[in-house]
Amino acid sequence: MSEQKPQVAEQAQELNSELQARREKLAVLRGKGIAFPNDFRRENLSDQLHAEFDSKENEELEALNIDVTVAGRMMTRRIMGKASFVTLQDVGGRIQLYVSRDDLPEGVYNEEFKKWDLGDILGARGKLFKTKTGELSIHCSELRLLTKALRPLPDKFHGLADQETRYRQRYLDLIANDESRHTFKVRSQVMSGIRSFMVEKGFMEVETPMMQVIPGGASARPFVTHHNALDIDMYLRIAPELYLKRLVVGGFERVFEINRNFRNEGVSPRHNPEFTMMELYMAYADYKDLIVLTEELFRTLTETILGSSVVQYGEQTFDFGKPFAKLTMKEAICKYRPETNVADLDDMDKAVAIAESLGIKVEKSWGLGRIQCEIFEETAESHLIQPTFITEYPAEVSPLARRNDDNPFITDRFEFFIGGREIGNGFSELNDAEDQAQRFADQVSAKEAGDDEAMFYDEDYITALEHGLPPTAGLGIGIDRMVMLFTNSHTIRDVILFPAMRPVK
């Protein structure tokens, strides 16, 4: 037997003993009819109190005679005979309580307070003061148990280090780790900031179907479900693009959606099967307008949320106050694989040889454009650390993008990269219904040849285009990856509250 098994058994026994003790305390409360009271009203938050009163001296606080009411989780407690200090945590942070036996109703201190446990949720009322060490505190005149916690805090609240537990039991992670709480506050600010920015630019927020008869808008493997009443298979959306462009056909010239997408693919530090994107579409614009808009969006968000356009991510520093770098796909390949030249990339046989030398398995169904894209991903993508727009994507890998007027082999499309990963994708939209129909047909051929990420043929979308889509540009940005940048997080699971996990057996 390993040394770890007796330790695990001992920990389980200790936990069971503590659970039993706490359940017995709850039974006593139930007997008194005060197990889970709901009549305590909180009036103050810890961060607001610190912001307003941290700068004041104790003499000022005594003169002001400020009465406050707080509530939160008991994180620490130091009992020193007739008096104790408690750390109370609420949504804003933490504040210290000073609890004296003589200042509470008779029996509360010894018969109730001392029997409470870390993790219990308390309500407290009292006067603000500062301790001899200068810490803002509340001298309690009332203290009540609002919720009895039956399970102990993780590791006696020295933090929750186990990654698996952090993701599976996010509530424990949020209780124990200040950084996690900060990350998800920033995520909320990013969502709010995007909405404010888009509304200010004249965009209307809309909602489109998450269950679709025909999945479209991206090349990905969808999740399949079955609608019992209609007796048809349906798909969780991989992107909202085709529905949003239908709205532009209908006359809503600037629309956006913050949406959940689902792709039945692998899980990695950069990928979660369920993820959040923002997509926008604007009529009478092209991909160059989107480049300007993207730079402005990132600059606005960083300055508003982080207080600076400069973001520190690991050992890298990004300045979103400056224009992003711009390279064509072929330029990027040649830059990061100098032995390659553009003429070789434009020659099918030579491009295949380059791809195979890089360990890329070239499929028979791939054309030259797909091979070029695979070479780019293998040679250049990980080197795009500073914010960079990559342009001139081949039409073969851009089935919804408008062809370039001067070179129909490529499209008016870009992807932008930060920290070696793709953050977003934008292009001038294909509004030629006949060209779109042919590209859908090409995608169907690719699917029949074994490409399970190729798109379906969407006849209704073709019908919509036949009614006329004005010149339009569209952009999609991965919210999760954006939040990773803004919070210096290096795995996508750290910025998704409840990431996909394999069930515990």
From Swiss-Prot:
The keyword Cytoplasm applies. GO terms for biological process: lysyl-tRNA aminoacylation. The keyword rRNA-binding does not apply. Transmembrane segments: none annotated. Signal peptide: none annotated. Homodimer. This is Lysine--tRNA ligase. It comes from Yersinia pestis.
